[in-house]
Amino acid sequence: GFVALLKKLPLILKHLH
C-alpha cells in the first residue's frame, strides 16, 4: 500500500546517497 511505500522511501534515499 501507500504507507508501505512511505516507509521504503528513507531506504531508497539512503541508496541514492
From Swiss-Prot:
Its job: Antimicrobial and mast cell degranulating peptide which probably acts by forming pores in membranes. Active against both Gram-negative and Gram-positive bacterial strains as well as against yeasts. Has leishmanicidal activity (IC(50)=25uM). Has little hemolytic activity. In the context of inflammation and cancer tests, is weakly cytotoxic to normal cells, induces calcium signaling but does not impact cAMP production. In addition, prevents LPS-induced nitric oxid (NO) synthesis but does not affect the IP3 signaling and pro-inflammatory activation of endothelial cells.
The uppermost taxa in this organism's lineage are:
Eukaryota, Metazoa, Ecdysozoa, Arthropoda, Hexapoda
Tissue expression, as annotated, is: Expressed by the venom gland.
* Gene source species: Xylocopa appendiculata circumvolans
GO CC terms: extracellular region; membrane; other organism cell membrane
Query: Could you tell me what this protein is called?
Result: Antimicrobial peptide Xac-1
Recite the UniProt keywords alphabetically: Amidation, Antibiotic, Antimicrobial, Fungicide, Membrane, Secreted, Target cell membrane, Target membrane
Q: Where in the cell is it found?
A: Secreted; Target cell membrane
Mind listing the GO biological process terms from this record?
defense response to fungus; defense response to Gram-negative bacterium; defense response to Gram-positive bacterium; killing of cells of another organism
Q: Which residues form a coiled coil?
A: none
Q: Which family does it belong to?
A: Belongs to the xylopin-like family.
Residue positions where Histidine amide is found in the record? 17
Keyword RNA-binding assigned to the entry: answer is no
